[in-house]
Amino acid sequence: NFFFMILLSDNQKLIDYLIKHRDEIVDISVPYKRTDTRPFFNANTLLALSGDWQLLKERALTFLNDEKKARSDLKRIPDHEFYVALADKNIKGMQEALDKLLELKLAKRAAKGTLLHFDFYLQPQVLMYAKIAAIHGFDLGIDSPIAPKELIDINPLVEYKIPYDFMKSFDFDAPHQVWVNYVKQRMEEAKQKKVENKKGFWASLFGR
């Protein structure tokens, strides 16, 4: 989940990017659909980050009030209880919702399959939601072995170095689709180069 990575980085430029380009990254008009909830859930996360309280609460209640939720989505109930409390600026409600996700059994179930490199020792949902709360000025006082305070507190680096040259040309003010198209183009170029290298290998092997 790249939302998690960006939020935990405390990189304000990237966080602002998610907020500014929210409507390009997710479709906030996507309705709740039991058979495919991922787009609905992703949109809710960015609504929470951008502070669109009324719409966030309406959508969260739509999910919570559905008596026929998919069994696989029952683990997302605390997430949406958190959203309602966040929209209401209810610190106790936020704490109670995230406390449920810190209970070992539910913590494991909620984290499973979300973050391959972290979900076996961190609770990603709690970290992400507590970070969103912190961004909006709410200290929930959470400090757990699977959701340590050090990762929730906002502590940006003095400098964020860009590790790859191809990323240095990206304009964070450009539409999100520009970046998507750029990455697709690079992937196609890499694929074509691989095909050409393969042809060159066989040509050299058989003298053609």
Model-identified regions with their sequence ranges:
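Terminal, non-catalytic domain-edge segments
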Residues: S72-Y83, D88-I91, E96-L205
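Eukaryote-skewed repeat-based solenoidal scaffolds used as protein-protein interaction platforms
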Residues: N1-K105
